[in-house]
Amino acid sequence: MDKIPEELEKILQITREQNRWRRLETINLIPSENVMSPLAESVYMSDFMYRYAEGKPFKRYYQGTKYADEIEELAMKLVSEISSSKYADLRAVSGTIANAGVFRVLADSGDKAVIAPVQAGAHVSHTRFGTLGALGIEQIEMPYDQESMNVDVDKAIKLIEEVKPKFVTLGGSLYLFPHPVKELAPHVHAVGAKLVYDSAHVYGLIVGKAWHNPLEEGADVVTASTHKTFPGPQGGLIVTNDDSLYKKVSDTIFPWFVSNHHLHRLPSTAITALEMKYFGKEYAQQIVKNAKALAEALAAEGFKVIGEHLGFTKSHQVAIDVRNLGGGAKVAKLFEEANIIANKNLLPYDPPSAVKDPSGVRLGVQEMTRFGMKEEEMRIIARLMREVAIENKDVKEVKKKVTEFRKEFLEVKYTFTNVDLAKYSSKVISLLI
């Protein structure tokens, strides 16, 4: 064939433009995203991506898995080490699948689960609209305290004692402040229930020692994503110290929720775990500093930043109320036009019906922190956001500023820089940029 098909040209063009736009030209403030290091990226594209390895390491239903067994076992060991856990399972291909496996083990259809309130950021997988509902488990929300922007502990204890659920979930997707694990765990266990902690957003902060470790405070099992504050490939994981629970969950993930578990994730996950072992504390601490700095700068620039009376945030996230600027949908779109990527989000006082045009915009600093930005850069970002949303400046002009600003921050930090990849490969596979 002398001429390549138009469709192929289009596929390559779209991929190149995506890489160029999101990787080189934008300020990405989506809290659920991050970037891998070049080292982790280099092992993501491998022969593992074509292979199957159903079951557990060294107990497979397929032949040809000796290296898959080794890499999965090593990745599990590294994740257990940084999580301070006895066990780790990396076969869940997302945080939602990790939740599904745990929920299925702990409750049957018709049973009750008490969840962190939606206002406190509960993820959709915790609700009747998501995984919980798909499994037929009844959702009961804990009371929410507007002042503390958190679970109302006293009322939650009373509810747990009355309902006697099979399990209780903490953790969320709009997650500014830690949920009360230590305060609730004894009462959860007193009624024979298990405490499930969804650390999808804060797992990198946990292993970086910038957030409390829920396993050390009484959680029975922790689920996570591997691509938010933990800057690995997209995927999920489960960690626990409970022997019996681990066996049940491990026997449920396969074959209930995954068959092949996307082996090509495992080398990248293992490298990211190593990066977090050696650089995670510095990275996580800078994330928290940057989030606080961004929140303070946004408030100084005239934005209504949620949680000011509590110090704005203790995580990687910042939330702003933009009702006076046209609402979350409008403002998030304006930001995107200026190459500032964020997402509209319900705020604690929004009704669920406002999901398509909520009061807020949710921000996260973990990716820009990985590219080396610090507190001063957060103040620059806040100023650029003011120009877009408050001063109504020409978004094209602001976009030029954003793109120019971003040129100074293209190198991933908090990684190993002394590895010669040429020693391990005769072909370097690079992004289409």
Curated annotation (Swiss-Prot):
Cofactors (names): pyridoxal 5'-phosphate
Question: Which GO-annotated molecular functions does the record name?
Answer: glycine hydroxymethyltransferase activity; pyridoxal phosphate binding
Family (UniProt): Belongs to the SHMT family.
What Pfam families does its record include?
SHMT
InterPro entries in UniProt: PyrdxlP-dep_Trfase, PyrdxlP-dep_Trfase_major, PyrdxlP-dep_Trfase_small, Ser_HO-MeTrfase, Ser_HO-MeTrfase-like, Ser_HO-MeTrfase_PLP_BS, SHMT-like_dom
Does the UniProt entry include the keyword Amino-acid biosynthesis? yes
Task: Supply one GO CC term from the record.
Answer: cytoplasm
Q: What is this protein called?
A: Serine hydroxymethyltransferase
Where in the cell is the protein located? Cytoplasm
As recorded in UniProt, its EC number(s) are: 2.1.2.-
